[in-house]
Amino acid sequence: MVKAFPVGKVDMINMQPMDFEEFLIATLGQDIIEILREHYENSTPIVDAMHNELLSLYRLYLCVGGMPASVNNILSVDRDILKYNKKIVKNIISGYLSDMKKYVKDATETIRIENIYNSIPTQIGNKSNKFQYSKVRSGARSKNYETALQWLLSSKMINRICLLKSAQNPPEAFKDEEVFKLYLSDVGILNSILDINFEDIILDQEFIYKGDIAKNYVEQQLNVNFEHIYYWKNNNTAEVDFIIKNKDGLIPIEVKAGDSVKSKSLNLYIQQFKPKYGIKICSKNFGFANGIKTIPLYATFLIK
């Protein structure tokens, strides 16, 4: 049986990040949301100048994340990343660790919670396509970490998505609870833990965790609108990053950090399960072709 650990109500409220929609409103105002919604619904490209500005804001959001204190700081320095105070997010992480020790009286469980949390950033792109306890600690087994995992989920510090064994309704009946992926609740915290060079993000350079960061960002945005999120893989190498259920049924979502046109796994899923359409989230403009709806990374929050 999983033990229940109390989580401070005030701390939980304070730790919830702003999503990118809220970040956009704070930077450009409400009107931009309605403009984006029109282009999203009609799959028509937005003007290049606005597209590029929104991509720049997306990359800025990757750096600072959505924690209110972090957003307030970047806005106070007119969005100048060189003047941004990185210590704000580091202090938030320290606060998380303090909460663990405050509310979890069992020292062993505290260590397990911290070990899971610290292992997530480097497991997002795990080649095994699932979270592995052996990556948390050598010889670790799931039964020993079940309580620690539940504490992190209950505290909303992390999000979990389960493997969907078959794309059938209801999806909850076809998920594999033993095979899952974990994401951090805030992409800014992820970048802080990984100690990513902000210049690489802002200038859209290639670096080792670029794809993983984009996926964590997308999961964070989807998590606002969907109670259940899944992923899919076959017995070979094909994998679809996210599966959501909306009014159109089960919809596969592929994430690309750049503007890659390749969608091998997404196309394979579409051929096999015949969804109404698939979604590709990348740095390209809005569009629709061959059954795939292309959505810019900055418009992920519009998926509902």
Features from the language model and the residues they span:
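Interdomain motor-coupling "hinge/lid" segment immediately C-terminal to the ATP-binding subdomain
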Residues: 1-122
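Active-site regions of enzymes building and remodeling cell-envelope glycoconjugates
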Residues: 10-12, 289-303
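Hydrophobic/aromatic beta-strand patches that form the interior of the parallel beta-sheet core
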Residues: 11-13, 62, 183, 230, ...
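Conserved nucleotide-binding/hydrolysis micro-motifs of P-loop NTPases
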Residues: 17-21, 165, 189-190, 285-286
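Accessory nucleic acid-recognition modules appended to NTPase machines
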Residues: 67, 72-240, 244
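Conserved catalytic cores of phosphodiester-cleaving nucleases, focusing on short active-site segments
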Residues: 218, 222, 240-259, 278
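Catalytic cores of nucleic-acid endonucleases
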Residues: 257-295
